[in-house]
Amino acid sequence: MSTDKTQVKLRFFTREEDETLHVNDAPIYAPVSLKRYGLSEIVNHLLELPKSMPFDFLIDGELLRTSLQDYLIKKGLSSETFLNVEYTRAVLPPSYLSSFDNEDWVSSLDVGSNYIYSGSYDGIVRTYNLSGKVEKQYSGHSGPIRAVHYISSTRLVSAGNDRTLRLWKTKNDDLKSIDEEEIEDGKTLAILEGHKAPVVSIDVSKDRILSASCDNTVSLWSTNYKEMTVIDPMEDLGGNVSTAAKKRRKLTLKDGSIRRRAPLALFESHSAPVEAVIFDKSDDTVGYSVSQDHTIKTWDLITAKCVDTKTTSYSLLSVAQLPKLNLLACGSSARHITLHDPRVNSSSKITQQQLVGHKNFVVALDTCPENEYMICSASHDGTVKVWDVRSNTAMYTITREDKNVVKGVNDKVFAVKWAKGVGIISGGQDKKIQINKGDNIFSN
């Protein structure tokens, strides 16, 4: 295989839903010297599109980043090999858009109602408008915040190292039927207590909240405090204490006047800290958690039972669901992302695929709102990577834009969110909320 005249037999196919992008699947011969651009020209010719469209190509699930000849050599294949070549619309690089300042490390991010919500190590939740202005701050946690999640235009939930979750009131609209009394905007509706160690992850589905903690447990809560059991902060004093002593205790107790609530259910099965938890996107009676005990657990949230455990070889630190593909993506302490089929009756093959490229812990994941095959990941190596899960290597790597970032000193990324209408939002040790392009990602 030496000359440019050498050809290889191949068949093009696509999984694009748009049928105008489907070619006839008859085999053709193409020069082995072709790279992505040349293959794109062939597909455009076959499609007879009015306007040329760039494509990416995958062979056996691997994105083609070289010539066909280099691919064949790398795989030890001859030019006699028949190649099935998948093509997809090319994805644009996630170009840098802007950065917002935060007062401390950014541990968590969410988006809702055209606002960005950040949880910070200074214990404050902040609401940013899309221009980067801080519109509101929520203070109450007594330690670093580890997770924040938008619930609705009137509700927000956060969790942190102080072992609690807090339900926040963001504004007064339509709340009179829910709340017993008017509470000022930006104030705590309820403190949710029950965990015995830092609460590091939360997810929300409709009126339910899941939390994961370093106490090895997962808890289920309601977004409406009336549904949860009241906790009396005086209860642990016992019945033989004078009224005066109780009054003194209440005065010294931080936030003593704020209502406190217990979880609807507590899930115990993990044997090490639980690092992340999510609801199933198509069935909110099912939850998934990942832990430093190397396992992925599936929970029946109705019966509070663990219905499936999948054991991997590494501590798991983050999780995201790709529902159309029946896959969970899990970030690990071993620097890679593993893909798993969470279904109880799925194949005995625990790990379906590994995505390799990060150089440190993979601590946050999110899915692309435009494409069921794409995810982004945040790592302590200082990068966010964009992946097509049909390939085991990253499509793009996003680095920190702040010039004050020193590699290995203050470049860890702790949080990433891929939000339609906003982009790929990330934050970490550099105290910046960085936004990269994440909308209209396909070339036209």
UniProtKB/Swiss-Prot annotation:
Keyword terms of this UniProt record: Nucleus, Repeat, Ribosome biogenesis, rRNA processing, WD repeat
InterPro entries linked: G-protein_beta_WD-40_rep, NLE, WD40/YVTN_repeat-like_dom_sf, WD40_repeat_CS, WD40_repeat_dom_sf, WD40_rpt, WDR12/Ytm1
Gene Ontology biological process terms from the UniProt entry: maturation of 5.8S rRNA from tricistronic rRNA transcript (SSU-rRNA, 5.8S rRNA, LSU-rRNA); maturation of LSU-rRNA from tricistronic rRNA transcript (SSU-rRNA, 5.8S rRNA, LSU-rRNA)
Region listing for Sufficient for interaction with ERB1 and association with 66S pre-ribosomes, in residue ranges: 99-444
GO annotation, cellular component aspect: nucleoplasm; PeBoW complex; preribosome, large subunit precursor
Pfam families given in the database record: NLE, WD40
Ranges: WD repeats: 99-138, 140-178, 194-231, 269-309, 311-350, 357-397, 408-444
Top-level taxon of the source organism: Eukaryota
Gene3D superfamilies documented for this protein: YVTN repeat-like/Quinoprotein amine dehydrogenase
SMART domains attached to this UniProt entry: WD40
Listed GO MF terms: ribonucleoprotein complex binding
Cellular localization per UniProt: Nucleus, Nucleolus; Nucleus, Nucleoplasm
Region annotation Ubiquitin-like (UBL) domain: where it falls in the sequence: 8-89
PROSITE patterns tied to this protein: WD_REPEATS_1, WD_REPEATS_2, WD_REPEATS_REGION
Function: Component of the NOP7 complex, which is required for maturation of the 25S and 5.8S ribosomal RNAs and formation of the 60S ribosome.
Family: Belongs to the WD repeat WDR12/YTM1 family.
Oligomeric form and interacting partners: Component of the NOP7 complex, composed of ERB1, NOP7 and YTM1. The complex is held together by ERB1, which interacts with NOP7 via its N-terminal domain and with YTM1 via a high-affinity interaction between the seven-bladed beta-propeller domains of the 2 proteins. The NOP7 complex associates with the 66S pre-ribosome. Interacts (via UBL domain) with MDN1 (via VWFA/MIDAS domain).
Record protein name field: Ribosome biogenesis protein YTM1
